[in-house]
Amino acid sequence: MNINLLNINKWTSKPLNLNSICFPPNLSFNYDNTLNSINLDEKYCLNDKIHCMRKSAECHRQVRRFIQPLLKPGVKYLDICKKLEQKTVELMGRNDLKQGVGFYTSWSVNEVAAHDSAIPNDTRVLKYDDVLKLDFGTHVNGYITDCAFTVAFNPVYKPLLDSTKDATWNAIKMAGPDVR
């Protein structure tokens, strides 16, 4: 029985220093319809907001990188939630108004549509035939990175994971940067 996670990309770039003053974009797309009538004051304010968003996104990326190898059949939901949130606090500090945990971790396993969560004394464990979506958030100055990822161990679910991933990327490309 293969207990490797399906559909998780290899991490190719090193984690960035979260105290950096510059977070380069990891991925960019060309768009025809972008806002181009921004004055200098708006541009300065926008740059500050983008910095907060990129820092939050980088923290989220590092937490995903940390947690994915820990996802295995037999692991308790509660243990994963605790480790994930502890890693966020380790990287960003205690959850406060400046930066930290954007919202508590939620799970969706199999037929559960969204927002289940582990509670104290929860004994549920991840199983080989489960399809798991793990959703968590980080924030900097209120700019929340809300991102989820889906994993499975059983190869029968690979087409489901591949089609979901393709649909997500197509939606991102179609939405563009000016969607509100």
Residue positions per predicted region:
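Active-site neighborhoods and metal-handling regions in enzymes and metal-associated proteins
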Residues: 1-180
